[in-house]
């Protein structure tokens, strides 16, 4: 809208940041923004990622990931996840802008990891308080290698070299709000450190089932020109892939670190 032509003042940016910390996900409909504004808005929160190692980018803007799905390129994020937790320092936030939205389907779900933690039984909270878990690339490796040729093998190996896996505390404390939250996700969390495979699988299976309850979720129906920002530290999300063979095009900028942390 017209706000991009006059810029966003520091007071307004601070209010958006404070609301993000409180509500975890913010939605702004009918925002006719330019790619330049998208990048500058994301930069107001912290340093941004460029370019993404897998996905293509918007022409002239290597910082903006182009997420384009249709019958020839079906979606691959239709499972619960927190972005790239297989890295030692996962990103702080994502700023996603809708360009082309199918008439039916293509919603996105978010869930609050702090609300999930708060709802856990006290005995289970005590059990997991000091546990750590291994996060690896999981099915994300399919983005690197979707055939058997040598180029894909090289790309996959480079992905393992860059990301490998990471170990994170199962329970974390938000650096700004001080809320505790459950830091695992079905896509990338593979093993509880120090547990047998059987015990680890049983615990993770219980927690994953608990985390996916609709009571902790919000479901958002996209319209074109909608801007959404979420705190990747304490949320999971799920992009529903129910719109094939129709087309869905999104632009995403990833904020690596929290400028105010």
Please describe what each predicted stretch is.
Residues 10-227, 232-261:
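Non-heme Fe(II) oxygenase catalytic core, chiefly the N-lobe of the double-stranded beta-helix
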């Amino acid at each position: 809208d017209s706000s991009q032509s006059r810029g966003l003042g520091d007071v307004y940016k601070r209010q958006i940041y404070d609301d993000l910390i409180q509500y975890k996900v913010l939605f702004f409909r009918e925002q006719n923004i330019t790619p330049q504004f998208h990048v500058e808005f994301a930069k107001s929160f912290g340093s941004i990622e460029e370019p993404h190692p897998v996905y293509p980018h918007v022409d002239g803007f290597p910082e903006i990931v182009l997420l384009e799905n249709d019958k020839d390129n079906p979606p691959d994020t239709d499972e619960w996840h927190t972005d790239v937790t297989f890295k030692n320092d996962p990103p702080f936030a994502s700023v996603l802008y809708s360009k082309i939205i199918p008439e039916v389907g293509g919603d996105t779900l978010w869930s609050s990891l702090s609300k999930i933690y708060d709802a856990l039984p006290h005995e289970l909270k005590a059990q997991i308080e000091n546990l750590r878990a291994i996060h690896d690339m999981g099915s994300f490796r399919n983005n690197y290698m979707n055939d058997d040729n040598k180029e894909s093998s090289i790309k996959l190996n480079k992905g393992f070299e860059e990301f490998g896996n990471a170990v994170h505390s199962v329970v974390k404390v938000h650096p700004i709000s001080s809320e505790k939250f459950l830091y695992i996700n079905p896509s990338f969390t593979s093993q509880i450190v120090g547990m047998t495979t059987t015990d680890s699988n049983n615990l993770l299976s219980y927690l994953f089932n608990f985390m996916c309850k609709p009571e902790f979720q919000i479901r958002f129906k996209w319209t074109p020109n909608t801007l959404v920002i979420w705190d990747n530290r304490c949320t999971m999300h799920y992009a529903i892939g129910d719109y094939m063979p129709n087309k869905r095009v999104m632009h995403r900028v990833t904020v690596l670190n929290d400028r105010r942390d």
